[in-house]
Amino acid sequence: MKKKIHPDYFKINVTCSCGNNINIFSTLSKNINVDVCSKCHPFYTGQQRTSDTGGRIEKFHKRFNISSH
């Protein structure tokens, strides 16, 4: 087996926006910030979020006070 061909592994900290910290080993040498993790993602928590942000057309109608059909 050849030596020094495998990347180095570093222990890094992954920080979620919910405050959860996860320590993992990675070939990256810096810490990572993520938006969602298994602690706060709806698939893992079983809680369903409703998204009340409309599409582009709804935003346009709302901005210019146009009634939709």
Curated annotation (Swiss-Prot):
- Which intervals of the chain form a coiled coil? none
Tell me the PROSITE patterns matching this sequence: RIBOSOMAL_L31
The residues the record assigns to binding Zn(2+) are C16, C18, C37, C40
Q: Which cofactor does it need?
A: Zn(2+)
Q: Which GO terms describe its biological process?
A: translation
Gene Ontology terms: cellular component: ribonucleoprotein complex; ribosome
Which Pfam families does the record cross-reference, listed alphabetically?
Ribosomal_L31
Q: How is the cofactor bound?
A: Binds 1 zinc ion per subunit.
Q: Name one GO molecular function term.
A: structural constituent of ribosome
Write down the Gene3D superfamilies for this protein, in alphabetical order: Ribosomal protein L31 (4.10.830.30)
Record key words, sorted: Metal-binding, Ribonucleoprotein, Ribosomal protein, RNA-binding, rRNA-binding, Zinc
Question: Record's family?
Answer: Belongs to the bacterial ribosomal protein bL31 family. Type A subfamily.
User: Subunit structure of this entry?
Assistant: Part of the 50S ribosomal subunit.
Family matches, as HAMAP family: Ribosomal_bL31_1 (MF_00501)
Q: What does this protein do?
A: Binds the 23S rRNA.
Protein name in the entry: Large ribosomal subunit protein bL31
